A protein has these predicted regions:
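S-adenosylmethionine-dependent methyltransferases
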Residues: 1-295
């Protein structure tokens, strides 16, 4: 958190480092051991730092490789909640890592990618053929592209493509210069569920569709279901994509509405059993359920 080379390069928030060191010093003092000047010096340095509106968070994958994200320190920033990583994204990534055969050599479309944790983790561990990150808020898309680059995926000069997913939509094709043969084709797409058409979705042709924490409002639910119906309708001769949605159940009524609306349009669903242990550190209190949908 403080002296690790990764955290020195990409420091966590000032508040977090201050709290961490304060608690560590308390625990050290409670052992009656010799004081460690290094801890006090580090805390003094942090106390003199100004708070920033942005910080970094790093998560270690089972391989030991990190996923590092630049995040907002505020839950709501720039009129959106999409500039931080939510627990559902962590749990969906964990499920994907434990079930990587569902993604290997396949084209994945992520709806509501936010700042990119789930997709970056999948791209680093599950070896998809192609991965389409999507969102609709300009600030989120900008931060998403930055985080993809931050994790070793670099936008190739001259390879940026403009594909109309809505009137001002844009996709950015990215690749990793370090291992180009092993890495998926990456796309960042501006995607508005309400205005996108079946014709515009034809180019994507995903084998797998995923989303995390996108079921929180009745209007969003209807737009999401409409989006899934469009994806089902434009599959041409291919079979329908597999769909996995990680839902944080904050309001049971909203969750039940989602299930009822799925039933109403004939989209089947089942609850995927929860994993037994956590790969990433997250709050175990939120009730996150992963659903498989059959469109």
């Amino acid at each position: 958190t403080v002296r690790h080379p990764l955290c020195a390069k990409y420091p966590p928030s000032t508040k977090y480092r201050r709290s961490f060191l304060t608690e560590l010093i308390k625990k050290h003092e409670a052992t009656a051991a010799e004081p460690l000047d290094e801890l006090y010096d580090a805390l003094a340095d942090i106390l003199n730092e100004e708070e920033s509106t942005r910080s970094y968070k790093s998560y270690l994958l089972p391989s030991g490789e990190p996923v590092t994200l630049s995040e907002s320190v505020a839950i709501v920033s720039g009129g959106t909640t999409g500039l931080i990583t939510w627990d559902a994204a962590l749990q969906l990534a964990q499920w994907a890592i434990e079930n990587n055969s569902a993604f290997r050599d396949r084209t994945v479309l992520e709806l509501g990618s936010g700042i990119g944790f789930t997709g970056i983790a999948i791209c680093k561990t599950c070896h998809p053929k192609a991965y389409v990150f999507s969102d609709c808020h300009p600030a989120v898309l900008q931060q998403l592209a930055e985080n993809i680059r931050l994790n070793g995926f670099v936008l190739e000069p001259g390879k940026t493509r403009h594909i109309q997913t809505e009137p001002q939509g844009q996709e950015e094709e990215a690749t990793n210069y370090q291992n180009p043969k092993l890495n998926p084709r990456l796309i960042v797409a501006e995607l508005d569920w309400g205005s996108v058409t079946e014709k515009q979705l034809l180019d994507l042709q995903p084998d797998v569709v995923i989303a995390a924490d996108v079921v929180y409002d009745p209007e969003i639910i209807l737009a999401l279901i409409g989006m899934l119906q469009k994806l089902a309708a434009c599959r041409v001769a291919r079979k329908a994509p597999e769909v996995y949605i990680a839902v944080t159940v904050r309001n049971p009524d909203t969750y039940h509405l989602f299930q009822a609306e799925l039933d109403k349009v004939g989209i089947g669903w089942r609850i995927i059993p929860a994993h037994s242990k956590s790969i990433f550190l997250y709050d175990v209190q939120p009730n996150v359920t992963i659903l498989q949908l059959f469109i």
